[in-house]
């Protein structure tokens, strides 16, 4: 069986090294294992992106998960196989990108909340209409806009172009805390981030 490969674009940031491409098997595990292991990985879309510094886990038994009430046309990708992108619109304004995890039918996913921009900064600045790197991808809606991700990318595989997620090359120090912007199960400590990162959407409680 041939392993999935994706071209490694040159970096225009400070982190040129990329690990191997994550395959769908990586995402076929518990969402609680996958979420913290995504911290430090590099998410690229069409050659633009950066280091994942913040995520949130959503399990199918979780009242805050879109899949909690069962399958709908909106969330059907969550009920499919792992390793695919689940894209939805938040508050009718922003697109958000998630990675589907666990075996098919489990309907669990990890929301990518923030990136440290490292690749394709010129394209991301143009899409966002600003220059400050810390503001390009410091939130799920911001990063989707910066990368150019929309509903047209819902259901695409994460191990094939235009997506690529590269395994982290070091073991980062990770912090955890309550998720943001939800009212149900708001106390679950299922938000994970890179300790002391300047690119988080919001600092973690100390």
UniProtKB/Swiss-Prot annotation:
Q: Which InterPro entries match?
A: Formyl_transferase-like_C_sf, MPG, MPG_sf
Which is an annotated GO molecular function term of this record?
A: alkylbase DNA N-glycosylase activity
Q: What is its EC number?
A: 3.2.2.-
| Keyword Secreted in annotation | no
Would the keyword DNA repair be found if you checked this record's keyword annotation?
yes
Query: What is one GO biological process annotated to this record?
Result: base-excision repair
HAMAP family tied to this protein: 3MGH
User: What is the protein name for this chain?
Assistant: Putative 3-methyladenine DNA glycosylase
- Organism, scientific name: Rhodopseudomonas palustris (strain ATCC BAA-98 / CGA009)
């Amino acid at each position: 069986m041939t392993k999935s490969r994706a071209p490694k674009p040159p970096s225009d940031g400070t982190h040129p090294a990329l690990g191997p491409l994550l395959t769908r098997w990586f995402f076929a595990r518990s969402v609680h294992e996958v979420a913290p292991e995504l911290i430090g990985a590099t998410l690229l879309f069409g050659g633009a992106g950066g280091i994942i510094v913040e995520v949130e886990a959503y399990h199918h038994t979780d009242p805050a998960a879109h899949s909690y009430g069962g399958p709908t046309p909106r969330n059907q990708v969550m009920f499919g196989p792992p390793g695919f992108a689940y894209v939805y619109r938040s508050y009718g304004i922003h697109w958000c990108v998630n990675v589907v995890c666990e075996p098919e039918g489990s309907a669990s996913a990890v929301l990518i909340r923030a990136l440290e921009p490292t690749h394709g900064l010129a394209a991301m600045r143009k899409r966002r209409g600003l220059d400050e790197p810390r503001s390009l991808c410091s939130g799920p809606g911001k990063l989707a806009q910066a990368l150019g991700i929309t509903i047209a990318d819902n259901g695409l595989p994460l191990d094939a172009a235009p997506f690529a997620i590269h395994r982290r090359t070091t073991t980062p120090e990770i912090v955890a805390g309550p998720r943001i912007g939800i009212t149900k199960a708001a106390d679950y400590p299922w938000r994970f981030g890179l300790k002391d990162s300047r690119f988080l959407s919001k600092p973690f409680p100390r």
